Regions:
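Exposed beta-sheet edge and beta->alpha loop/turn motif
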Residues: 86-130
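Amphipathic alpha-helical repeat elements characteristic of tetratricopeptide repeat
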Residues: 26-30
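Bacterial N-terminal signal peptides that target proteins for export
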Residues: 1-8
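C-terminal motif of bacterial Sec signal peptides marking the signal peptidase cleavage site
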Residues: 17-20
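Short solvent-exposed beta->alpha transition segments
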Residues: 31, 42-94, 99-101
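Bacterial signal peptide processing site
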Residues: 22-24
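Hydrophobic pocket/interface hotspot
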Residues: 36, 47-48, 117
Length: 130
């Protein structure tokens, strides 16, 4: 009986460990988008560039430029991977970017675009929107 209990315990612990590893790597595209949006609202150009694929970097910097005259913050950010298209992970976020100018807030709904995230050099990078 003791041996059986030990085998069951080891099996459960092993299963939980494997689940943690799989879910951690599955969240990498989501984390990439969350980090990208954080860099965007903090106006961190260098970080935004490193979180963008080469093909998307110019677009990311244009988006950053559009926020230069306003104060920005994220509100209620929650992202999840909604699927994939070949090697591209699709990530949808809920929440808003709030842009403030002269004490007036403008809310930009994040759920209107789906982020395309690809793996380059072992890193997940934002590489477009739909």
């Amino acid at each position: 009986m003791r041996k059986f209990f030990l085998i069951v315990l080891v099996t459960v612990i092993s299963g939980l460990s494997l689940t943690a590893c799989v879910s951690g790597s599955g969240n990498a595209p989501v984390k990439a988008v969350e980090d990208y949006l954080d860099a965007l609202v903090k106006k961190d150009e260098a970080r935004l560039s490193t979180l963008s694929c080469g093909e998307w970097e110019d677009d990311a910097l244009l988006e950053l430029d559009s926020f230069q005259a306003v104060t920005t913050r994220l509100d209620g950010l929650a992202c999840s991977q909604t699927g994939s298209d070949g090697d591209t992970a699709l990530v949808l976020c809920n929440g808003k970017i709030i842009a403030t100018y002269n004490d007036e807030d403008q809310e930009l709904d994040l759920s209107v675009r789906t982020y395309e995230v690809v793996q380059e050099g072992g890193e997940w990078l934002v590489c477009g929107v739909r």
